Amino acid sequence: MSDLKAIQARSLEMAEYFVAFCKEHDLLCYLCGGGAIGALRNKGFIPWDDDLDFFMPRKDYEKLAELWLQYADERYFLSKSSKDYVDRNLFITIRDKETTCIKPYQQDLDLPHGLALDVLPLDYYPKNPAERKKQVHWALIYSLFCAQTIPEKHGALMKWGSTILLGLTPKSLRYRIWKKAEKEMTKYGPAESDGITELCSGPGYMKKKYPIQAFEDNIFLPFEGTEMPIPVGYDAYLSTAFGDYMTPPPADKQVPHHDAIIADMDKSYTEYMGECNARKN
């Protein structure tokens, strides 16, 4: 198993490639969550953080999926669920095929189990309260039928309802339902909206509303000897999402949030596939 520093080094390497790719193709991206906080508070990783995540406006996010297949280094695999491929995520992940990072919820899947960089889309938040309720409704449907996984951390009622819905829905229909939901939840534009929201980050974050201006551009800040982008309106975003983001959490909360069955930054996941397959049985 690789240590935290090795994982951070590979994560930074991936992030540098990703940001350079976005620059080359005129795509807007910014660090989000702990990566953005680390850029401001630590000029690098939060010491206990083990990954970097990015936001992209929806239109750039959709372009990324097309451009990556044409122009990106084959070492980095873009994973995005489709009709015949489900990775149990709600968003794009970029996977480094020269590394290994096997997550419990994906260990039985046939996909590149390399270290992941998460890329999450941002969508418009409609002004009309009734439309906003519809958007959240569709986002929850999208979350269930795209991930095709029973949520374990959002209460017994949601777990029970999700189990029934998935159980009653044939696999052949799940893709059609989630594509319908995705279309409905992302149909709003700036004219009918007064905010930006996260629809693919889970039920908690889809309740958030950020100023549109916060994500109109990015700024680059020092980050581990290089520079990384964060939203131009980072304070409005981070204070809404996390409150007093410049104050570190208590010591008992300063731990990595992501678990991995195997994490090896020096070997490709292909060298572990036998072990991974054994865990399925």
Model regions and ranges:
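Short, His- and charge-rich active-site/binding loops that engage polyanionic ligands
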Residues: 136-139
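Conserved SAM-binding loop
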Residues: 64-66
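Short amphipathic alpha-helical patches
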Residues: 45-46, 60, 143, 261-266
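Conserved catalytic core of two-metal-ion nucleotidyltransferases
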Residues: 2-25, 68-127, 147-241, 248-281
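Active-site nucleotide-donor binding segment shared across nucleotidyl transfer reactions
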Residues: 19-52, 56, 61-62, 213, ...
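A short secondary-structure junction signal
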Residues: 129-134
